[in-house]
């Protein structure tokens, strides 16, 4: 049986409908598989299966929102949206490399804890009080400057959330980092990021998109292939 669909979303809906029909014929999940040409193409299927509560697992790969480059992008967006998001700060403060070593990150954490402030505020105060190494100060100051710039882009300039991520990828050096090392793995990462940008277009703004990601990554699926 050959079916044609006009886009990935329609394809995911059509195939999920076929899966549900197949399951009603007493087949188990172990009898069903979806083959994709490229790993980024799983995203539409994952979104659909989460929406209808259909359990799944990915063989030979990682779920879309758990891929390192996607988590990096989401961390940037989360920190732009909420400056007190310490988990996001930790993930991206030296990603790409900004000469902010482990000892400096440890210092930021200690200062944050001692003064009951976020990691971002701790970083600003360490710079202001000249308590951080000169080389680290340059990288950290640049990072904080960009964070402030991106917040102004979305709040004052009203830059839409899709364009915002494109700016982040370009201005942070993240895209260049992936493009400069030309191999299959980084090509796949760039394709995954393109798919993320496409997914973001389905939402009205940054906040609803981040809420969707939080929901998608919080779902704990119990897999039982015999059901």
Where are these regions (language model features)?
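Helicase P-loop NTPase motor core
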Residues: 1-55, 78-82, 114, 153-158
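C-terminal helical "lid" of AAA+/P-loop NTPase domains
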Residues: 106-111
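Accessory C-terminal helicase-associated subdomains
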Residues: 28, 96, 125-227
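Conserved short internal alpha-helix adjacent to the catalytic or cofactor-binding core
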Residues: 1, 51-54, 62-96
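Helical mechanochemical/support elements of P-loop NTPase systems and associated helical scaffolds
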Residues: 4, 8-11, 15-18, 38-41, ...
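A short beta-strand-loop micro-motif that forms or neighbors metal/cofactor-
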Residues: 112-125
